[in-house]
Amino acid sequence: MTEAAKTETSLRRTLVGRVVSDKMDKTVTVLVENRVKHPLYGKYVLRSKKYHAHDEANQYKEGDKVEIQEGRPLSRTKSWVVSRLVEAARVI
């Protein structure tokens, strides 16, 4: 691997979240939650954001915990790719 290729892969952001929708073809909606400290009161508040991520094989289902990685824009709303499954959804 060349030096330029190493720095390119390390610049991509990765996030971990839950799949909340798998209804689209080759796309999943991933909810990423993070805790942020309130600037004035100091209390930790839960913030969340939804990302559309590319799922080439339609293998990830609702409830799965996945890692997504930033990539090139694939559509108007989709520029993230699911890189791996962290934890499968529990079936009740």
UniProtKB/Swiss-Prot annotation:
Description of how the protein assembles with itself and partners: Part of the 30S ribosomal subunit.
Annotated GO CC locations: cytosolic small ribosomal subunit
Similarity field: Belongs to the universal ribosomal protein uS17 family.
Gene3D superfamilies: Nucleic acid-binding proteins
Biological process per Gene Ontology, one example term: translation
Keyword set, alphabetical order: Ribonucleoprotein, Ribosomal protein, RNA-binding, rRNA-binding
InterPro entries, per the entry: NA-bd_OB-fold, Ribosomal_uS17, Ribosomal_uS17_bact/chlr, Ribosomal_uS17_CS
Gene: rpsQ
Protein name: Small ribosomal subunit protein uS17
GO MF annotations in UniProt: rRNA binding; structural constituent of ribosome
Role played: One of the primary rRNA binding proteins, it binds specifically to the 5'-end of 16S ribosomal RNA.
Native species: Cupriavidus pinatubonensis (strain JMP 134 / LMG 1197)
NCBIfam families on file: PRK05610.1, uS17_bact
rRNA-binding is among the record's keywords: yes
